[in-house]
Amino acid sequence: MFEAGRIRTLWELVEYRARASYGMPMFHDGDGRSVTFGGVRDEALRVAAGFRELGIGAGTRVAWQLPTRIETVVASLALARLGAVQTPVIPLHREREVGFILAESAAEFVLVPGVWRGFDHTAMVRRLAGDGVRVLPVGDGLPMADPAGLPVWDPDGLPAGAPVGSGATTWIYYTSGTTSSPKGVEHTDATLLAGGIGLATALGMSADDIGSIAFPYAHVAGPDYVIAMLVSGFPAVILDSFEPGHAAAVYRRHGVTMAGGSTAFYQAFLDESRRYRQRLPRAGRLIPSLRLLSGGGAPMPPELYAAAGRELDCAIVHGYGMTECPMITMGTPYDSDEQLSRTVGKPVVGAQVRILLPDGSEAGTGESGEVTLKGAMLFRRYTDPALTAAAFAPDGSFRTGDLGYLRPDGHLVLTGRLKDIIIRKGENISAQEIEELVRTHPAVAEAAVIGLPDQERGERVCAVVTPADPAAPPLTLEGLTAHLRSAGLMTQKLPEQLETVGELPRGGPLNKVLKASLRERFTA
């Protein structure tokens, strides 16, 4: 039986699961390889010994830009065994982001995959890395040595010589930086453990389940998900890229019971299922074993919840988290359809959510304000002390910058971002509220609502949409505003400008809409 209080570090959890489930599968990949929990532990020990021979030890700052593979998980666990400070970097990041992260994190070593998907990561990082930074291409295999040479563990569960103790920073993640420079977010093993335990508890995963990782493992959700696997003892299919048809085929082969990653995955599986049934009308469900589709990272329109749930014939549970706190709330398989489609669930075990009004007082039930939180899964600090000072309220709670309210049933509803507010003639307007209604128009596939500078109003409301049917007559502003009026949207919130694009610009590991790019494009 797993006892959270006895596990203080990621490596302790690896050892716990290896003892409990040594010969049970932990990973299956898209190339037909499988490895057990015990095999991952043993491999990580050999790699840790190899890293140590290269000079990596407790407190060494190691950045890695590696694809989502079994070897990447092994490398990160090996670094955890050594007590290194890890900085994962999304594989799609290029010179601008990577250069900033390497310099800001003061990386001493950088692990890269060599040439991956036609791009030479080794050459890029060698151009960017400062003097004294060692670049280690690991495309042909991780360094290995005899684990007998590793330092013994002290009573606190960290390698001898590790700095500070179990509360030391061991992970530095960088926000996607879609609106500004990336922020360095410092986590400890303990904060990530708390998030992973919250995820495992909310979803009720067990050793009978088979999960999936098709999103970047370098995202903070990667180790969080692996922690949930280690806590509950379930295996997962791991893919180094996500293509819906290929992913669905691999999931069918292995009997995956839980899939997901973000709202974009819901839409991708919905579209793939429709194509699948068109090709094979008698084939049945896209993934017959699937019982849960879960994710977060972006709003989930209720109509997408309904359509994907019907098409895939499974429960859809959406959550809320961020780099600073990867697991805040999560829906559960036991919630009602109304709760799952209209909220982001209840706070997970250990998370304390409060809603603050602009004057700093606590909002009442159903009253909207800024979402603030405390909990064991909350990051330690930003690498920039000024950002840290600005991010916390006087009572020590973290200001998320998100707007929302708590319902009487304890579920959280997100209504927008503090910085995603359009100020029109002095009135604050939530872009998310309008987006949700714009998406209900039958001519609209996707929508983003932005504020544009306006001499008379301060800002005007602009809706940017992609057409559901590109061959159909284009949607007009008059047609859209009539639809929004019929949906009950007040006149002051109606869009004053409509733009139609082939696709919305997206970026970051969760494929979020780049609103700054849209504002720049459509500002007159």
Where are these regions (language model features)?
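Conserved beta-loop-beta connector loops within the AMP-binding
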Residues: L340, Q352-T372, P408-D409, P470-L477, ...
